[in-house]
Amino acid sequence: MPIHLECMSHTPLHGYFDPAPAVVAEVERVQRAARERVDAFDPELVIVFAPDHYNGFFYDVMPQFCIGASATAVGDFGSAAGPLPVARDAALALADAALASDIDVAVSYRMQVDHGCAQALEVLTGRIDRFPVVPVFINSVAPPMASCRRARLLGDAIGRVVARMNRRVLLIGSGGISHEPPVPEIAGADDVVAERLIAGRNPSPASRDARQSSTVAAARAFAAGDSRLHPLNPAWDRRFLELLERGDLTAADGLTNEAITRDAGKSAHEIRTWVAAFGALAASGPYAASIDYYRAIPEWIAGFGAMHARERTLSRR
């Protein structure tokens, strides 16, 4: 059965601190076009590769990869909250396949996902509960982190199962590209911050609001050029998008963690979600991909990109 892929940057700042109206309209046109493609494809299963921003996964036990057998969206930054319609049998089959391929993936029956997953579902399908879904968490902010190569191999293991499914499957990669929002780090953190990174589940509304206000303030400073956050890197972003477009996925294996942080910022590690999604698609053979959008948007502290792809034999359908 056919497989369709959509990869897109996410931003929690949309609606909180926006660029010029013309830029917002531009992004929303790209998002509408992506949703129209998804509507036309009418998936029977959605697999979302997404990061987390210390809303669902913490240093008490920080897996590199985790597949949700049951999941709930926490609703941060105004994103949708509530249970996801997880396709449990499919989730467990994907976990078995990953483990059989020597990818040590965790499984959660109480996964919490944040805007990194929920926003992608809202933008691309209209709501978080429209289609059966399997959420796949990829650690992208909490060192130590697995390599891009491991993310590609995770995608390949999942994709080989997807290729045998008798249903239409939508693959989503949510995150990236160059960006470095003010995500706290456990290295050098004081006791209060460290405890939040270790066991910060289910924060109070006041605590969540304070964190969101801090992020908005950081975005204002970044857009004004008054910030120590890593600058956006459009040239790096375009090189990454182009390697995905031409199907040169093993080139991503050479993107070391140190180089990603140095060249594109500490949260650019979210490119792993794109690498995994494309790895899953490539497991079915050559694909045809399109770079649909790219713009560096400082108000959102994001190199904002979008791509879609299909198996090459189906790309004209």
Swiss-Prot record:
Its EC number is 1.13.11.16. It catalyses: 3-(2,3-dihydroxyphenyl)propanoate + O2 = (2Z,4E)-2-hydroxy-6-oxonona-2,4-dienedioate + H(+); (2E)-3-(2,3-dihydroxyphenyl)prop-2-enoate + O2 = (2Z,4E,7E)-2-hydroxy-6-oxonona-2,4,7-trienedioate + H(+). Coiled coil: none annotated. Keywords: Aromatic hydrocarbons catabolism, Dioxygenase, Iron, Oxidoreductase. Pathway: Aromatic compound metabolism; 3-phenylpropanoate degradation. Transmembrane segments: none annotated. Its cofactor is Fe(2+). InterPro entries: DHPP/DHXA_dioxygenase (IPR023789), Xdiol_dOase_suB (IPR004183). One of its GO terms (molecular function) is ferrous iron binding. The active site is at residues 115, 179. It is an enzyme of class 1 (oxidoreductase). GO terms for biological process: 3-phenylpropionate catabolic process. Homotetramer. NCBIfam families: PRK13370.1-2, PRK13370.1-4. Catalyzes the non-heme iron(II)-dependent oxidative cleavage of 2,3-dihydroxyphenylpropionic acid and 2,3-dihydroxicinnamic acid into 2-hydroxy-6-ketononadienedioate and 2-hydroxy-6-ketononatrienedioate, respectively. Belongs to the LigB/MhpB extradiol dioxygenase family. This is 2,3-dihydroxyphenylpropionate/2,3-dihydroxicinnamic acid 1,2-dioxygenase. The gene is mhpB.
